[in-house]
Amino acid sequence: MTTFRELGLSDSLLQSVESMGFEEATPIQAETIPHALQGKDIIGQAQTGTGKTAAFGLPLLDKVDTHKESVQGIVIAPTRELAIQVGEELYKIGKHKRVRILPIYGGQDINRQIRALKKHPHIIVGTPGRILDHINRKTLRLQNVETVVLDEADEMLNMGFIEDIEAILTDVPETHQTLLFSATMPDPIRRIAERFMTEPQHIKVKAKEVTMPNIQQFYLEVQEKKKFDVLTRLLDIQSPELAIVFGRTKRRVDELSEALNLRGYAAEGIHGDLTQAKRMSVLRKFKEGSIEVLVATDVAARGLDISGVTHVYNFDIPQDPESYVHRIGRTGRAGKKGIAMLFVTPRESGQLKNIERTTKRKMDRMDAPTLDEALEGQQRLIAEKLQSTIENENLAYYKRIAEEMLEENDSVTVVAAALKMMTKEPDTTPIALTSEPPVVARGGGSKKRGGNGGGYRDGNRNRSRDGRGGDGRNRDRNRDGRNRDGNRDRNREGSRDGNRGRRGEGQGRPGSSNGRGERKHHSRKPQA
């Protein structure tokens, strides 16, 4: 393994890294950082949980001249959650160097951001729409930018951000370094690389690292109407410390979180329709452990970096295999073990095969637990807790009463009574969830999403009346491209949570191939 001291980083960054408890670099960090420090353009293919933020963050921070009061680097991320997470990590890494980091994203008061921009941050981390909004307002100037990072570029493509990214890249100086990270490399991302990058160094994490060997993966064949009972029985049997349950739509997330609370589980949901304050509140409670189950849509959970997640439950099978990899990457981090469960309805077996092809891993089948098995699972958990108490606690104060009880009852009866009192009886409160259509793989291959509605039987099931939906645009926008509150960072993730009819790989926005503006870049290649 390569240590961070071998990578040629400055002393102030090494001090931060070591204070965070890191000594050895991950594979993506060890391969990326030396090339990036030399000023080379980088294409990095890596999933979340591989340490890619530090892979681009360390060389980005290393180049910053803190004596200059100007923006020297920008990181473009697909969602506000990821922008916040990346900003927090860069702040920690750049703390001893005193690098000023500013996250900017939609959903936050733009005037507050304008005031913060006047304090001369060195690095901006933001979503494409909000960055472009500040550029157009002339509240963000990029004339001194030396490094541009595109984080989760394929996800930004899926959310319809390619045109915004091209507009941002045409506004940075001709001579700059570009670091592009993407789990996959669809054609529009390749075209971005060809146009805006110079002889990029291509770094790819090996398949065995991408498929996350620390995660045990299981699938259960279960009918749609029985999924909720199966989920609660698994929660009773497995008793996860922290669990994330993935639903396909915002409606599903709302109904699931409410139903789990009715059954006695501490659960809350997160999706694109929540206010930023509410999202942060839910995430804080989840990190603190005051809620044990987080129910989320794919986009809302994108970029979350929460330690201690032991279980991921895919209540709804994802629309595409790549989303499955992102989902299960919430667990099994930092060398710890994790468990991922996938619910598969009878018509979704083809999508299961697609996922297994992508991950290069055959999942183990698990039978859906019965009510009796859930009860037995609860009893075994209580028995383990009792045994731990016997081995680790001082019980002298309780032994006199225990001896009196044993004079009148046999020991087995006493222990059985204790188990009964402590066991959480499986709740069978009737729950009615709105059924979601199955994701049916078509043509035996990886399903493309677009005009066919992303696998829904009736096409794009949440399209707006004017026929739009799936390109991530919000109907509330007026003619100048802004929504009612002037927030140009259109809530793409909100529409995507409930409406997955997004463009397939290989498709950007109409007319996006030419970008905006004709100004040449140092790395732009001649047109044939």
Curated annotation (Swiss-Prot):
GO terms for cellular component: bacterial nucleoid; cytosol; ribosome. SMART domains: DEXDc (SM00487), HELICc (SM00490). One of its GO terms (molecular function) is ATP hydrolysis activity. It catalyses: ATP + H2O = ADP + phosphate + H(+). A motif (Q motif) lies at residues 2-30. Residues 214-374 form the Helicase C-terminal domain. Its EC number is 3.6.4.13. Residues 458-506 have a biased composition (Basic and acidic residues). It comes from the Bacteria. It holds the Pfam family DEAD. Its main location: cytoplasm. ATP binds at A46, Q47, T48, G49, T50, G51, K52, T53. Residues 33-203 form the Helicase ATP-binding domain. Belongs to the DEAD box helicase family. CshA subfamily. Oligomerizes, may be a member of the RNA degradosome. This is DEAD-box ATP-dependent RNA helicase CshA. The lineage of its organism: Bacteria, Bacillati, Bacillota, Bacilli, Bacillales. The gene is cshA.
